[in-house]
Amino acid sequence: FIDNGRIIDLISIGVVAEDGREFYAVSTEFDPESAGRWVRTHVLPKLPPPASALWRSRREIREGLEEFLGIDGPEPVELWAWVGAYDHVALCQLWGPMTSLPPQIPRFTRELRQLWEDHGSPRMPPRPQDSHDALVDARHNMRRFVLMTTGHDIASMQVGRLSGGQTPG
């Protein structure tokens, strides 16, 4: 996301579900000119080419997320992120004001960093070399979540699945 002190504007979003499904999209509506130096250096170069089908309007991203999250399904939606307050705002703004957010979408994102501290700050895997790509970060957060909640590192299970490329903030 772009954060210039006045706006939080979604650039891309990556989501990984516990069942292994993935969602990834890049907004066609953010203004790269408003990105600060850090985002220009660490985020924008990792985006797919603009001709990619992964570039979508905010409406298309919103609708894709509603389907991916199964907001009409029986399971409640639970969101987790590492220091995810601004990420949550960028997500919610896809629906406009908070009052327009579907009731199935949580009004908060659970905090992986706090879970890590509550578990005694256990050793975590290093950040991937290509971090700051929304999908790479989401995969890494899922890896950390599973490691903290089960004690198992899923990295060896992901190798085969990840070699096939990206599928889905």
Feature map (PLM): residue ranges:
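Short beta->alpha linker loops
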Residues: 60, 83-86, 107-110, 133-136
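Acidic, Mg2+-coordinating catalytic module of metal-dependent nucleases/exonucleases
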Residues: 79-84, 123-169
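Substrate-recognition/cap helix-loop segment adjacent to the acidic, metal-dependent catalytic center
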Residues: 85-106
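Substrate-binding/catalytic groove segments of enzymes
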Residues: 98-102, 122, 152
